[in-house]
Amino acid sequence: MRKLSRREVIKLGAGVTTGAALGSAGMSFATSAAAAEMPFKPEPGARLRLLRWKRFVQGDEDLFEKNIAKFTKLTGVPVRVDHESWEDVRPKAAVAANIGSGPDIIIAWYDDPHQYPDKLIDMTDVAEDLGKRYGGWYPAARTYGTRNGRWISIPWGAAGNAMVYRGSWLKEAGFERFPEDTAGLLKLCRALKKNGHPPGFALGNAVGDGNVWTHWLLWSHGGKLVDENNQPAVVSPETEASLEFARQLYETFIPGTTSWLDANNNKAFLAGKIGLTANGISVYYAAKKGKLPIASDIQHANLPVGPVGRPMELHLLTQMMGMGYSKYPKAVKSLIHFLMSKEQYLPWQQASIGYITQPLKAYASNPVWTEDPKHTPYRDCVARMVSNGYAGALGYASAQVMADYVVVNMVAEAASGTLTPKEAMKRAEKRVARYYRI
């Protein structure tokens, strides 16, 4: 897929609306032709209900709703969209799957589909068609979307995390560029605190930011929850080293981070209370849209590499699940394929300035990643990530460990001094073992 210009992306987003110039007859013909080209056709009389998480970036919701309306216009299938808080999507999805009633499509997190794979619509044909059209899936996306060789969900992308910092404060701290390793990160954090601009990283049960940076912290030092055979492997010198690093890092933090959820670091950064955090592009988006003076000073950098010597990152992967109880499985496939197709996906990424990083390789050429250099660090988040089940396989156990915030809690306990690093990792291993015995 060649690189598209921003003008071309905007034209894609216009879609069938450009047919308005043809008059009502021409518009009807254009709509019918576009619908005929859709590879997955809905059932006659289908109607859908979709549940998704509440947006952090307004452009995401605006273009999503337009794409839904466009689908309805093309197919005649009405779609009701419900929005839930990030923390509430997971339990609501689990209840719906288990009672066999609820939304036809649920957009959930990480490996949620692996908790109830047999209660989902087989999406293999949809995934294979999208992969052929758009350069293939990144390895992490394939890992999350498949189980035993079958696609059980369609990765929508990942709300990528990067280091978000104030460029002027970085220089005041004596750094010309953001450190590329964890040792340099600790030096920077100490310097920022000394200058009155402390860092702040979420250590509460935050679905996104808390999970993302604590898994990176563990993995970047060589730690892991389980080995390749899904056997608990938390207790190790590498895990202890990661928790000792967390303790030193925490000493530089602004007070209160152990209770922070996904919105807290955004608010603290925009208020000028912290000079560094791990976050999505939403902070920059809010500053730009709000015309805040700090927008020009906000910078982004990829998460530093730790002692393992290579990127070991987790990002907030979100997946579209077709629920097996749906009366309209063909319409479910049709809508999901439609939303993932370039005519809808690329303009949606543009509108949200890259809040979601693509799971399909061809979409890396979207000009949203290069039109503003501050967007670029988020472009490769899915390419750089591994699954939260590392180093084992995804499944019920990995999903439950994630839902129970085992890694976040372990890091928070060791960092804050509630437990020693040894005590924290031993407690975490017991929790991991409980799930992996099932």
Question: Which residues are covered by each model-predicted region?
Answer:
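N-terminal secretory signal peptides and thylakoid transit peptides that target proteins
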Residues: 1-20
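Conserved C-terminal helix/tail region of periplasmic/extracytoplasmic solute-binding proteins
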Residues: 42-43, 69, 78-79, 118, ...
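Extracytoplasmic "Venus flytrap"/periplasmic binding protein-like
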Residues: 66-137, 146, 168-180, 268, ...
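Extracytoplasmic/periplasmic solute-binding protein
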Residues: 148-156, 161, 186-232, 274
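Glycine-centered hinge/linker elements that transmit conformational signals in sensory
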Residues: 188-195, 229-258, 303
